[in-house]
Amino acid sequence: MILLVIGTLLVLWIFNQMYWRTRPYPPGPTPLPVLGNIHTILWEYPGLAPLNRWKEKYGSIFTTWLGSKPLVSVADYQTIHEMFVLDGDSYADRSAFSTFTEEYRGGILGIIETSGDVWRDQRRFALHTLRDFGLGKEEMQERILYETVDLLDILERESTSSGTVSPMKHIDQSVASVINLVIFGYRFDEQTVHELKRNREMQEELIIMSKNPLLMIPIAFPKMAKVWPFKKMKDGLMAIRDEQFAFFEKNIEIHRKRIDYSNDECDDFCDAYLKEMERRKDEPETSFHEKQFVNVCIDLWSAGLDTTSMTMGWGCIILLHHPEVQQKLHEEYDRVIGSDRLITTADKNDLPYTAAYINELQRYANILPQNLLRQTIKEVTINGVTIPEGTAISPQISVLMCDPEIFPDPSTFNPSRFIDENGKLISVKQLLPFSIGKRQCPGEGLARMELFLFFANLVHRFKISPSDPSNLPSLEKKFANVGRPNPFEVRLERRFK
């Protein structure tokens, strides 16, 4: 009798997990109990293939499950524009695994994870302060060009001495130096690069952990984190979290000890935030406090590094697979620049093929397999499909990037798709590497400037060749939250002696 009751309850639970709970949402693949559909994404990383299959089978609005959490995906441009631009307020909140996020971050904090007035205040302050420090202006260009020259010189020295060079660690250091200078006022040099190296090592450790689909269990069901082996998984995660936070807390404390609150001038973002905290300290509901500060710094620092650095890495690899594209870039530089001088943003309008290459690079590399999740603030109906209030929802930008109706023959790398018959750059509104709507990446301006200046000057100075022409670097993405290239080496030949 007991076994019969247990069996009946088990069947009912499985029925609820795989069918009953899915009824209020748009159709989608059947979720497994506990795991949902996360196993499919992990087994077919980066997950683009199953997303395309589900779009074809269920339509452009479909539901998948991240453990116990339903996620509605939107995978066509017209609907994405209607929802996230024309009706952006309805989808502006962030969706998260609340209990886990609160424990990992110390609360629902920062810019990425927050919603409502807190998110608006923090985002507004960050954007305003970044503009004050030269975002999109000549001052920021000078900082990036300084790092660009340093990067090119390091690559040239190492390539000359060793014959080949692994560019990713140097690209990482240069891109990280730009954002770290803005936030904390110093770049990563020989004395401080160990900090960046350790941050990268911790990120690799997190990536290894996240490959295990069982990690979703203590995240989705926090009480399970007290039970072995989930407790061990969570403890490992939190140990890395503590060390990561320590880097930011240390830098904030250094600034706090030396800051002069009577001086309105700020040397970096950290100074500006400390002074804003001081200005608002008597406000009872202020969102400018210590825990918020650390999380905002983490959000800005991470957003300012990963996507730009990884895109640069893919840019090098793709040139090795497409030497004819590199030849066209060199021809454009020889025609327009004509010397070994640095390329600046003043040259951008005269370098349409470079701009087209970067556009196609962002489309083809498609490094964000899953956009950060948003949340409906009310029940909504779109294209006849009703989505309940409080539902996680995401514009599937990665699916748009390989949609053959938008980009014919999407598996082919072709910068010329962005060039018209007169050799002018074509603006394609469906190209959304920085997302769309109210949650669009706040660092887009900085990232665009970095990609242009770093990349154009790299290819202008060097002919980039494979270390082994018979064994080109893989185009397979390494498992990560951002699609990373596998380690690779190149040969560099200076074009101007």
Region spans (language model):
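Cytochrome P450 heme-binding "Cys pocket" and the immediately downstream C-terminal segment
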Residues: 323-326, 444-482
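Cytochrome P450 substrate-recognition site 1
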Residues: 21-42, 47-140, 166-167, 171-181, ...
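Terminal signal-anchor or tail-anchor transmembrane helices
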Residues: 1-22, 449
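Classical protein tyrosine phosphatase
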Residues: 25-32, 73-83, 92, 186-196, ...
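Conserved cytochrome P450 K-helix/beta-meander segment immediately N-terminal to the heme-binding cysteine loop
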Residues: 395-422
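Cytochrome P450 heme-thiolate monooxygenase catalytic core
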Residues: 94-103, 137-312, 328
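Conserved cytochrome P450 K-helix E-x-x-R motif and the immediately C-terminal K′/meander segment
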Residues: 38-59, 242, 246, 342-384, ...
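Cytochrome P450 heme-thiolate "Cys pocket" and heme-binding signature region
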Residues: 298, 421-451, 476-478
